[in-house]
Design a protein with these regions (language model features):
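Acyltransferase
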Residues: 20-25, 54, 246, 271-294, ...
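Short helix-loop capping/hinge segments that flank enzyme active sites or metal/cofactor-binding pockets
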Residues: 69-89, 248-261, 302-357, 369, ...
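Structural helix-boundary/capping segments
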Residues: 33, 111, 161-259, 264-266, ...
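An N-terminal boundary/leader segment
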Residues: 1-50
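Residue-level signal for inorganic ion chemistry
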Residues: 27, 49, 221, 258, ...
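Short glycine/serine-rich loop/turn segments
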Residues: 69-211, 263, 370-387
């Protein structure tokens, strides 16, 4: 059962050929089997998940099918508030924190009948791309347990990749959905800034924070996005923009114009990733009407750190010892950026977001490698100095948080050592339907799920 896609499992559930209880039990058994090695979950909602599954089974048997997520086990990154369930942010500071309200995306998932199976491990407070710095221990890559799963949504990516859940919700401030998706061989989508509510999600950098799905294929990604996307009038960053039928859009056959962004995204690539990109570009050429080389505007670099410090200053000033070494050092470094530099960077960010749409005049979509390098070992990650400059694997993902553009990572090959490689595709604001449609075409052409 764990190898089924959301779409496949949903069809079987709707036709009453399998039960939500059996599906959930299968995931719980997989968690019991694999989580001691992978460390993808911080909290497994065992009893609650089974109760949700039994409720879903009763409704479906009575003919009250809520939609494609009804009865499907879904995981949540452990900085997304869940009423009555620990939400730790992978930090000693919040090790016993229990929210009283659900995040908006949790409310939407519950309304859709999803079975929330547990809270997933991450980089402490989501600041970093390894998931090796967690109060609850590092997340291990399913393809090589000595290597990082990526981050900060590493637990979510690893859980989906191993069938511990059918999909997951992560957050992405500099690549934290797309980079672990690439490292774990799955699909990860960062929607347009404001497309998915962040209310009830512990912030990292509010100007750059996005919430998005991680799934094993593009169809499942579309189904999960359909449920969590939409305006939230209580979230000041939420965009009031129309929602497309994302699953239906996958069947639309077009040949878009593709923009290849060479600098700096194709520079200093690992040789095996470079080879995978060459092969992917050949396939993209067959799926597109034109392929051009495109330049993107530079992005300001002094936005994230001051915003992170602003979020944490009240905790850090009183309880610095409750932060892990990596997070503690990063917060100390953040104090070096003065207020004027931040204000100027924030103004530049607004200008970049207003102007970046111009790059889509000659093209419809942009393509880059998701990461320039494969995942490093957990030991290497732990030995690294806490500096954003050292996280080369986030170089290609970070700019798209600044742009706010919808961006997806999909599998496009493996290294000789069997480590997954990701292809990154981006489109104009609120073009998720077209983006998913093209990602689906690539997925089908390369026979990857």
């Amino acid at each position: 059962m764990n190898e089924l896609s959301i779409a496949e499992a949903s069809d079987l559930l709707r036709r009453k050929q399998i039960s939500p209880v059996d599906l959930t039990t299968s995931c719980l058994n997989r968690i019991e089997q694999l989580n001691p090695t992978i460390n993808a979950f911080i909290t497994v909602m065992h009893d609650s998940a089974l109760a949700q599954a039994r409720a879903a089974e009763t409704e479906i048997r009575a003919g009250n099918w809520r939609g494609p997520l009804h009865g499907i086990p879904i995981g949540l990154k452990d900085l997304i508030d869940t009423a009555g369930v620990k939400t730790t942010c992978a930090s000693a500071l919040f090790a016993d924190r229990i929210p009283t309200k659900d995040a908006e995306i949790v409310r939407r998932l519950k309304r859709a009948g999803a079975v929330l199976i547990g809270k997933q491990n991450l980089q402490e407070f989501a600041w970093g791309g390894t998931s090796a710095s967690s109060y609850f221990g590092p997340v291990h890559n399913p393809f090589d347990v000595d290597r990082i799963a990526g981050g900060s949504s590493g637990g979510s990516a690893a859980a989906v990749a191993t069938g511990m859940c059918f999909g997951a919700i992560g957050t992405d401030t500099g690549g934290s959905v797309r980079e672990p998706a690439a490292f774990c061989g799955i699909v990860g989508l960062k929607p347009t800034y404001g497309r998915v509510s962040t209310r009830g999600v512990f912030p990292l950098s509010p100007s750059l924070d996005h919430v998005g799905p991680l799934c094993r294929n593009v169809i499942d990604t579309a189904l999960l996005l359909q449920v969590i996307a939409g305006h939230d009038k209580l979230d000041t960053t939420s965009a009031d923009a129309p929602i497309d039928s994302y699953a239906n859009a996958l069947q639309v056959k077009t040949k878009p114009r593709i923009g290849i962004v060479r600098a700096p995204f194709f520079e200093d690539l690992d040789t095996e990733i470079e080879h995978a990109m060459d092969e992917a570009l050949k396939q993209l050429g067959q799926l597109s009407s034109d392929v051009l080389e495109i330049d993107l505007p530079s992005t300001p670099g002094a936005v994230q750190a001051p915003e992170v410090y602003a979020v944490h200053s009240k905790y850090f000033s009183t309880s610095p010892e409750l932060y892990g070494p990596w997070m503690r050092e990063r917060l100390k470094q953040a104090t070096a950026i003065d207020r004027v530099a931040y204000i100027e960077a924030r103004q530049e960010l607004d200008r970049v977001r207003r102007s970046v749409g111009d790059v889509f005049s000659p093209v419809d979509l942009l393509v880059t490698p998701t990461t320039p390098v494969p995942p490093i070992t957990i030991r290497e990650a732990m030995d690294m100095s806490p500096s954003p400059a050292g996280e080369l694997w986030l170089r290609n993902t970070r700019p798209f948080n600044a742009y706010g553009l919808p961006t997806i990572s999909i599998p496009c090959g493996f290294t000789r050592a069997g480590l997954p490689i990701g292809l990154q595709i981006s489109g104009p604001n609120f073009s998720e339907a077209n983006l998913l449609s093209f990602a689906y075409a690539f997925e089908q052409a390369t026979r990857r799920r």
